[in-house]
Every structure is written in structure tokens, then in C-alpha cells.
From Swiss-Prot:
This is FMN reductase (NADH) RutF. Catalyzes the reduction of FMN to FMNH2 which is used to reduce pyrimidine by RutA via the Rut pathway. It comes from Escherichia coli O150:H5 (strain SE15). InterPro entries: Flavin_Rdtase-like_dom, NADH-dep_flavin_reductase, RutF, Split_barrel_FMN-bd. The lineage of its organism: Bacteria, Pseudomonadati, Pseudomonadota, Gammaproteobacteria, Enterobacterales. The gene is rutF. HAMAP family: RutF. It is an enzyme of class 1 (oxidoreductase). The keyword Transmembrane helix does not apply.
Length: 164
């Protein structure tokens, strides 16, 4: 039996490129946000995506109580914002670093994100240290920027949308 240790798993996962997202919420438990690359599509009928959130994260209780979130997929050039939301910076300073609109769920939408998915959490499944949040998409807001941002091999990389 081959047992995969934590470092081997993390090293292997660094080979999988992923979009960089800031996940936000606002509601009775307050306003919070964090950076995540563990986000993916589940189904288009009904439109659903998933977000993985460590139950030990300081933001977990806020998302758990609010039950709404917005997945803001970042554009190239927004790396400093990703770093800010990925650290221990106080929430008010994180949100003060960018311009936001309010989505239909009441969650903050980043004005210059590549795309924003405004969602209600429809189901939560716990696996190991994380909760997998299944998110029913209520609204999508796409932005005109031609540059995406991915996390690959432990660093940021810009992607350019092909010219039509």
C-alpha cells in the first residue's frame, strides 16, 4: 500500500493550475473574505460550483452562519489583492483595498474581477480539515478584462484571452 504524505500531496497539487479567487460574504455574522484556488464547477443544471474552506480558518464561522458567498475570479494585476485576502490582514483593511458592489445575495462583488458568481450555500460536506461548500449560483457578472490569473507551481501567472 502506497501512503502519500502531506508534502508529497502538496507538491503534486502545485502542478495543477487553478484560477485565483477571492471568496466574500456579508450578512448577520458580518463581512469576511479569503483567497482560494480550490473552486470548481459542479454542474450547469442547476448552475452550481464548489468552494473548499478550512474549518480552522478565522473566516469559517462567518461563512457558516451567513450561508451566502460571492466567488470573485481575479484578473492579472490583482495579485496584491490576492495576497492581502490570503493573509492575516484585518477584514476592514482587505475590503478597503478595492472597490466593491453588492450582489443579489448581499455579498461583496469585486468591481474589476474577471467574473463574479453570487451564490447561496446549498449543501456542506466535511472531508478531513475542510468543508466543501456547494454553492447554487443566483447571478453571474462578467467583466471585460482580457487577462485572467492562475496559480501554478506556487506562483501567479497571467493568461490572455484569445482575440476574437
Amino acid at each position: 500500500m502506497n501512503i502519500v504524505d502531506q508534502q508529497t500531496f502538496r507538491d503534486a497539487m502545485s502542478c495543477m493550475g487553478a484560477a485565483v479567487n477571492i471568496i466574500t460574504t456579508d450578512g448577520p455574522a458580518g463581512r469576511a473574505g479569503f483567497t482560494a484556488s480550490a473552486v470548481c464547477s459542479v454542474t450547469d443544471t442547476p448552475p452550481t460550483l464548489l468552494v473548499c474552506l478550512n474549518r480552522g480558518a478565522s473566516v469559517w464561522p462567518v461563512f457558516n452562519e451567513n450561508r451566502t458567498l460571492c466567488v470573485n475570479t481575479l484578473s492579472a494585476g490583482q495579485e496584491p489583492l490576492s495576497n492581502l485576502f490570503g493573509g492575516k490582514t484585518p477584514m476592514e483593511h482587505r475590503f478597503a483595498a478595492a472597490r466593491w458592489q453588492t450582489g443579489v445575495t448581499g455579498c461583496p462583488q469585486l468591481e474589476k474581477a474577471l467574473v463574479s458568481f453570487d451564490c447561496r450555500i446549498s449543501q456542506v460536506v466535511s472531508v478531513g480539515t475542510h468543508d466543501i461548500l456547494f454553492c447554487a449560483i443566483e447571478a453571474i457578472h462578467r467583466h471585460a478584462t482580457p487577462y485572467g490569473l492562475v496559480w501554478f507551481d506556487r506562483s501567479y501567472h497571467a493568461l490572455m484571452r484569445p482575440a476574437c
